[in-house]
C-alpha cells in the first residue's frame, strides 16, 4: 500500500517531500554547525525553490496551469532577460550609493549575521518583519549572490535567477487566468502578446537593474490575484 501511495504522488507532491527533507537537513546543519558558511546559501536556495513550488501550486489551485507553449514562452522571456541584464550591467558604470545601496548593504548585514550563527541570521531576517520587509528579501537573494564578487552589479544580476523565474511563472498564470475569464478565442496569440507586453513594462526592470529588488513583492501580489 505504501508503494502504491508513493507511485500516486504528483511531481508537486514529490517536490514538497523533497523540500521537507531538505528542511530537516538544514535544521540539523543549523543546530550542529550554527556558524557554517554553507547554511545561509543553502537556506536561500531552499527558500527560492520552495517559493517557486508554491507558485506552481497557486497555478494549479487557480486552474491556470501552463502547457508546453506557455512554458516555452516563459523560458524565452527569461533567456532574453538574462541577456538584457548582462548587457546592461556590463556596458555601464554605476556607483551604488544612497537608496541604490540599501538592499546591497542589507545583504552584507545578513551575511554577517549568519556568520555569527544561524539564530542570529534568522533573527536579522524575521526580527523586523512587522516594520520592514526588506530584510526578508535577503533570504531569497543570497543564492546565487554568494557565488559572485559581491558587487552591486552582481546583486542586480542575481535577481534574474532567484526572483524572475517565480515572477514570470505567476505572471504567465495570471495572463492565462484572465484569458479564461474573458473567454479569449485565440489563446495562443493572446498569451504571447500579453506576456511580451507585460514583461516589457519598464517598471518591472528599471529598479531591478539598479539593485532594488522591489519587484519581489509582485510575486505575492500575483499569487493573491490568482487565488
Feature locations, PLM:
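Short helix- or helix-capping micro-motifs
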Residues: 190-199
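Extracytoplasmic catalytic/substrate-binding loops of multi-pass membrane glycan-assembly enzymes
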Residues: 90-108, 115-143, 150-153
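Helix-to-loop transition at the C-terminal end of transmembrane segments
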Residues: 32-37, 83-102, 209
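Start-transfer (signal-anchor) and selected internal transmembrane alpha helices
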Residues: 1-86
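Membrane-interface starts of transmembrane alpha-helices
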Residues: 36, 40, 69, 150-158, ...
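Transmembrane-helix motifs of polytopic, lipid-linked glycan transferases
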Residues: 157-184
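Short acidic/glycine- and proline-prone juxtamembrane loop motifs at membrane-interface regions
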Residues: 203-216
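Specific aromatic-rich, kink-prone transmembrane helix
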Residues: 216-227
